[in-house]
Amino acid sequence: MQKGNIGVTTENIFPIIKKFLYSDHEIFLRELVSNAVDATQKLNTLASISEFKGELGDLTVHVSLGKDTITISDRGIGLTAEEIDKYINQIAFSGANDFLEKYKNDANAIIGHFGLGFYSAFMVSKKVEIITKSYKEGAQAVKWTCDGSPEFTLEEVEKADRGTDIVLYIDDDCKEFLEESRISALLKKYCSFLPVPIAFGKKKEWKDGKQVETAEDNVINDTIPLWTKKPSELSDEDYKKFYRELYPMSDEPLFWIHLNVDYPFHLTGILYFPKVKSNIDLNKNKIQLYCNQVYVTDSVEGIVPDFLTLLHGVLDSPDIPLNVSRSYLQSDSNVKKISTYISKKVSDRLQSIFKNDRAQFEEKWNDLKIFINYGMLTQEDFYDKAQKFALFTDTDGKHYTFEEYQTLIKDNQTDKDKNLIYLYANNKDEQFAYIEAAKNKGYNVLLMDGQLDVAMVSMLEQKLEKSRFTRVDSDVVDNLIVKEDKKSDVLEASKQEALSAAFKSQLPKMEKVEFNVMIQALGENGSPVMITQSEYMRRMKEMANIQAGMSFYGEMPDMFNLVLNSDHKLVKEVLADEEKECSAAIAPIQTELEDVTKRRDALKKKQEGKKDEDIPTAEKDELNDLDKKWDELKQQKDSIFAGYAGKNKVVRQLIDLALLQNNMLKGEALNNFVKRSIELI
């Protein structure tokens, strides 16, 4: 028996391995099974070039549980005593830091032939045994034993067949790995597509009302997964079946892309476009990354462009660099090339479907839209390609490319400054009246109700030349597209003041909501009262919800305009009645107000151009008193108008009708509206 120390100068390398090199203890099984598969594949390679002339026989890798042990057995190339010394014992580095650095620079040489991958066994084991026999003729079987210290023993043993058994004596704090269900789940996670059969126990069947083991191995993996096959060999049903195996709880995918490239990097895989739910983040991390059919991670940021992390599927590449635990990706030029390649393949596939089967593309647009919009917002190259097949959808459900839509609206939706105005709604039901008003003017209205449409609107205004997006409820219909300079309002100032004060006094008090009353001549057939919301302020608040650094806008109140149509019969009647009821009380106040205004204006004119110290104190005091008096008289007038409005049910009824149309009338206010409606009828 040979005894010795593993060739490291640090007292004990294993705590370093546990702490720094592996993020998840569970990957020990992946590493050891992968090593067994590598050893088996090497034997196959040697046999194919006639360097091994014996019988290959059954090459299944077996994983088995004992009372306190896990054993991984293969019938691969095995190891000689010299090879154990080379690959296991002689990790001859000057210290732990150099050890880590050396590994980082030489990962591929070590992983896959025992080496560091093997040492992951000590994360869960108090003792590890290697019982191995080389395929070489006349080779002597040996047994290597180590308890996690730098000391080991190596002795000759009897072993009938070539290959390697690794026996792990599981630590007391890792007993979970002795449970059949735990090992079964890990094998399913990491080893489902390894290229050599992996058996865990025996298949079971129901007999006499209970499950019993059969003599047949329970092989847990598909050795020739779909992505390793040629697309020409596969049917649509094959792709759908594989998707169901990967994601049994998901709806059928929209379509898929089969990747297969050998130069300048190796990459195979299948990416599926899923039906996306409403929450973007819930659907990330669904692409599984493999390295030569060994599962690595489902965190593919950096390999897959960010907008495509919403996709499902598998990618397999030996050219993606991994750290020691194979759980995180390193920055690398190959990765950037792969990311660019995937983005191009996706845009080419979308372009192909659009070109060859536009009806199918339009049918699936609502599901595709989030991927395409996300890509256009985050990747300039993708935007350049996607603008040819990205679609607008109008409120009638018709689809247009960007170019088609520009042609459609150019004649009727260009304003006086030659800007093309894109009208849109984000809720067909709530904005129905506004949509209908726009359509009655001959305008087309887009439906932009997607999760990313707020950001898309802002981006498209920058990308599309002389183009502006305006929501249909941001102004009265005549002001949405201003084609010529407007005439001034027909109502004189005193009448506007009376109407405005009356309606303003009856507006409801709502948390974080402010109203501004406006009066416009909108024609006898226009609505008597409407509520609009400034496009700019609303958009800033919407962007604040999705973009960091704009929380200031999110804290501001919602600003709405209550627009009175001075041409409408009901508004005219309210104004006439108000003048009749209030004129006697208003007249003396108005006379005094005019006198105050006249004197105040005269004083201000007199003080124009003078420095503050040159203005007599008496004049300053008088002007201050006049300002206070003016405010007081104005409040008296507003109070009289408010008193009138409070008794006039039509004023509140018109306001509530506008609120109702805008989905802003609820609870007690809605109940009061219903009662008042009955009384008025």
Swiss-Prot record:
Pfam families: HATPase_c_3, HSP90. One of its GO terms (molecular function) is ATP hydrolysis activity. Residues 327-545 are annotated as: B. Keywords: ATP-binding, Chaperone, Cytoplasm, Nucleotide-binding, Stress response. PROSITE patterns: HSP90 (PS00298). The keyword NAD does not apply. Residues 546-681 are annotated as: C. GO terms for cellular component: cytoplasm. Coiled coil: none annotated. InterPro entries: HATPase_C_sf (IPR036890), Heat_shock_protein_90_CS (IPR019805), HSP90_C (IPR037196), Hsp90_fam (IPR001404), Hsp90_N (IPR020575), Ribosomal_Su5_D2-typ_SF (IPR020568). It comes from the Bacteria. Residues 601-620 are annotated as: Disordered. Its main location: cytoplasm. It is found in: Cytoplasm. Residues 1-326 are annotated as: A. Disulfide bonds: none annotated. Homodimer. Belongs to the heat shock protein 90 family. PANTHER family: HEAT SHOCK PROTEIN 90 FAMILY MEMBER (PTHR11528). Molecular chaperone. Has ATPase activity. NCBIfam families: PRK05218.1. This is Chaperone protein htpG.
